[in-house]
Swiss-Prot record:
The gene is ssb. Keywords: DNA-binding. One of its GO terms (biological process) is DNA replication. This is Single-stranded DNA-binding protein. CDD domains: SSB_OBF. The lineage of its organism: Bacteria, Bacillati, Actinomycetota, Actinomycetes, Mycobacteriales. Residues 123-137 have a biased composition (Gly residues). The keyword Cytoplasm does not apply. Residues 148-158 have a biased composition (Low complexity). Residues 1-110 form the SSB domain. Pfam families: SSB. One of its GO terms (molecular function) is single-stranded DNA binding. It comes from Mycolicibacterium smegmatis (strain ATCC 700084 / mc(2)155). Gene3D superfamilies: Nucleic acid-binding proteins (2.40.50.140). Residues 117-165 are annotated as: Disordered.
């Protein structure tokens, strides 16, 4: 949306993501990313850690379930999202304001690690347009994937090998 402040942060999860469900059944995962800048000190010839930035993040629907299944405390991640300010009142009646990241995209950082990515397929209905549901298999069977095999001969409905566009 126009006017939103977009941020990308690279850091480590401080704890396992916490997965919850709204009364309407939408999944939401909450987690904190700690990002610590490193600077090279030429006088000492050593790398020094700067002051850590801790950002509270939330992600919704199917992506929330994927995060909860895939990421754990200490995972190095790349997060892109929008900064949102939220005000609330504590049980003691104190007014508080927090700034959080509403996550659009998240993935593991491959700078110091490797990852195997599996396309998630979830069964069941759900809200939000992402088709979120309860569980399901992590990877669909090849027979269910129309793009999982080479096209049959003559699939472009012509005798030549040219595509129809």
């Amino acid at each position: 949306m126009a006017g939103d402040t977009t941020i990308t942060v690279v850091g480590n999860l401080t704890a396992d993501p916490e997965l919850r469900f709204t009364p309407s059944g939408a999944a939401v995962a909450n987690f904190t990313v700690a990002s610590t800048p490193r600077m090279f000190d030429r006088q000492s010839g050593e790398w020094k850690d700067g002051e850590a930035l801790f950002l509270r993040c939330n992600i919704w629907r199917e992506a929330a379930e994927n995060v909860a299944e895939s990421l754990t405390r200490g995972s190095r991640v790349i997060v892109t999202g929008r900064l949102k300010q939220r005000s609330f009142e504590t049980r003691e009646g104190e007014k508080r304001t927090v700034v959080e990241v509403e996550v659009d995209e998240i993935g593991p950082s491959l700078r110091y690690a490797t990852a195997k990515v599996n396309k998630a397929s979830r069964s069941g209905g759900g809200g939000g347009g992402f088709g979120s549901g309860g569980g399901g298999s992590r990877q669909s069977e090849p027979k269910d994937d129309p793009w999982g095999s080479a096209p049959a001969s003559g699939s472009f409905s012509g005798a030549d090998d040219e595509p129809p566009f």
